[in-house]
Amino acid sequence: MSEPILTIRRVSRRFGGHRRFLAPRAPTIHAVESVDLDLYQGDSLGVVGESGCGKSTLARTIMGIIPPSEGEIYYRGRDITGLNGGERRELYKQIQFVFQDPMSSLNPRKTVREILASPMKELLGINAAERNRRMLRLMDIVNMRPEFLDRHPHEFSGGQAQRIGIARALATDPEILILDEPVSALDVSIQAQILKLLISLKHDLGLTYLFISHDLAVLDYPSDRVAVMSLAQPTDA
């Protein structure tokens, strides 16, 4: 078997435990405890568990949104747990995130055009003409009409907004998508459409997925393998 492109070793994340002025020490919350996972190129690894077991905390730790309390995370053999700002921006070209609630993750003041242009401009530094070409392609591959580029997020349904969220994640042409409950905020009929789109994109673009959900039935469709998080620890399903 080939080497994993993303390796998680003994990663833990704890909150609290700090002494507060003139108050008892805050209790320690073990959000993620000693997690080991391997993600291979072209893989779709599902991570399932009940709400509160640390799935979303793990995803945010991988992305560097919050640091791990212990452990290491490797991308293509490089430890990415202590990257500085510039190094983290380079990593975000290759690893992108799709959020649970598309409406809260899209800036309501910006048009879709501005939302999609932002990562291309900030992370890739490409010119306006190339950004426009890429935006049209992104809208096409998520099955959205090009005229929607000049609309704002509140003008879309939940399913349409999540398609925009997926397009934004694909704007840097990443290798890995971390999908944190990407369909849980959607109606069941729309969930099926988004899952079908994600499977199609994985095959067409050669993507690798870490797919997080509380619903094993949702993961059964897009996942090659599933790990179960229980008491903040994953075990093979």
Predicted regions and their residues:
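Conserved ABC transporter NBD signature motif
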Residues: 71-79
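Helix-to-loop junction immediately C-terminal to a conserved catalytic motif
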Residues: 63
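ABC ATPase NBD coupling module
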Residues: 21-26, 80-96, 114, 122, ...
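Conserved ABC ATPase signature
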Residues: 152-156, 160
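Conserved catalytic motifs of ABC-family nucleotide-binding domains
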Residues: 173
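P-loop NTP-binding/switch modules centered on Walker-like glycine-rich loops
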Residues: 186, 190-237
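Conserved ABC ATPase "signature" region
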Residues: 79, 129-147
